[in-house]
Amino acid sequence: VSAGDLVIAHAAVREDGLSRKIVPVSYPATATPDLIIKLRSAANSAGINCHEGLVLTSDMFYPHEILGSDLPLWQRASVTAVEMEVATLFVICRLHGVETAAVLAIDGNPLNQDGGSMDTYNPNQDSVRNAVTTSITLALEALTG
C-alpha cells in the first residue's frame, strides 16, 4: 500500500486507547457488510482500484526510538493500513445501531521510513490529495447511489 492508494476497511484491530474504555477489547470493531459492498461497487463502477481488509487503529502511529514498532508484526498478520480512528468509530456505531464503513486515503507507509524516522514523510502530494477527493466521492456514491 502506497501514498495515494485507497483502502476499504472491513474491520479494525483495536490498539487504540479510547475503544478499550467503551467495551472490552474482545468486542470486534467491524464495518457494516452492506456498506463495504456499496463502497466496492462504487469503486468498481468508477474503475478505481481499492485495497480491502483489516486496518490497525493505533494511537502510536509512528515508531518510537525506545519502544520500537510492532508494525512489521501487523503487516505479517495481513493488516492493510494503519490509522488512528476507525476502531472507535466502528465500535460506537455498532453499539448505537448505526451502519458504518471506512474508505481510507493513504498518505504514506511508516514501514518505508528509514530507521523509523519520519523525516521524509510528506502527506502533501498530489496523489494523496486526489485519493482524499476520490474517497469522498466513493463514500457519497455508496451512501446515495
Which residue stretches match the model-derived regions?
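Glycine-rich phosphate- or other oxyanion-binding loops that anchor nucleotides, phosphorylated ligands
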Residues: 1-145
